[in-house]
């Protein structure tokens, strides 16, 4: 199984985009969860509107699937301006960024996803644009080349990244508003599932929404994806309504257990428990034992398991925690 095949992967899949767009909240009052972030944004947005200024540049960071793109769109809606969206890997040349910047109107939002992947040459162009609303570009080539400055309208750059530490210090320092998104609690995810079901005109009760939410790994994108699959099951196997019974059976059929684990998660945990007596075990040995690349374990499988307290990283290797043993109804040896 590869990451792109996993139902519970947080990265966006092709089928998510159009459906997620319909489910996205448009304004801050419709946005569920991230209470501290919402409270801060309300103040910053109102202050900028009162002064009739562009909002400060904003960096939104955190794990994938938590709503960074949605939040950028909400900022534009709240400010009553347009938003232009792109991503770091797409901006290969300075001219690519210059074309976007020169088409912005006063107050507009420029959203750059995966901003940590900007090339150095593009990043250099961004510095004066962010600080002074100026664009330094080279005209011509060789000895005849000359630099000209173009004035830009005040704008707001919203950068999104899953790896804030990968940003260069000069770029990170130019964001006046850093916002970290955290994994969602089950209550907030239940609210999101219920709202999405309403958009889909799907009958769901509170227990059904809760069951989907608690298996969604704290991630709205996964919750919405699971909801769509549970809807299929409810319409084919039952009367179309989603109850706790229907959600449990649908998600069990999809091999997503009570903790939101799939086959790959359980395979990793059981390898540590059964093959290495609970650990510690080195990454290379673990990769060989389950037939996966070490990068897949480190970047895809481990983060959620560590965050939830099922695995510990130690200097000697990976260790399965008491909670991991309890999940499989096993007793951890002393």
From Swiss-Prot:
Residues 185-255 are annotated as: Small ATPAse domain (RuvB-S). It comes from the Bacteria. It catalyses: ATP + H2O = ADP + phosphate + H(+). DNA binds at residues 294, 313, 318. The keyword Nucleotide-binding applies. Keywords: ATP-binding, Cytoplasm, DNA damage, DNA recombination, DNA repair, DNA-binding, Hydrolase, Nucleotide-binding. Gene3D superfamilies: 1.10.8.60, P-loop containing nucleotide triphosphate hydrolases, Winged helix-like DNA-binding domain superfamily/Winged helix DNA-binding domain. Its main location: cytoplasm. It is found in: Cytoplasm. ATP binds at residues 24, 65, 68-70, 131-133, 174, 184, 221. Residues 4-184 are annotated as: Large ATPase domain (RuvB-L). Disulfide bonds: none annotated. The keyword Metal-binding does not apply. Mg(2+) binds at residue 69. SUPFAM superfamilies: P-loop containing nucleoside triphosphate hydrolases (SSF52540), Winged helix' DNA-binding domain (SSF46785). Homohexamer. Forms an RuvA(8)-RuvB(12)-Holliday junction (HJ) complex. HJ DNA is sandwiched between 2 RuvA tetramers; dsDNA enters through RuvA and exits via RuvB. An RuvB hexamer assembles on each DNA strand where it exits the tetramer. Each RuvB hexamer is contacted by two RuvA subunits (via domain III) on 2 adjacent RuvB subunits; this complex drives branch migration. In the full resolvosome a probable DNA-RuvA(4)-RuvB(12)-RuvC(2) complex forms which resolves the HJ. HAMAP family: DNA_HJ_migration_RuvB. The RuvA-RuvB-RuvC complex processes Holliday junction (HJ) DNA during genetic recombination and DNA repair, while the RuvA-RuvB complex plays an important role in the rescue of blocked DNA replication forks via replication fork reversal (RFR). RuvA specifically binds to HJ cruciform DNA, conferring on it an open structure. The RuvB hexamer acts as an ATP-dependent pump, pulling dsDNA into and through the RuvAB complex. RuvB forms 2 homohexamers on either side of HJ DNA bound by 1 or 2 RuvA tetramers; 4 subunits per hexamer contact DNA at a time. This is Holliday junction branch migration complex subunit RuvB. The gene is ruvB.
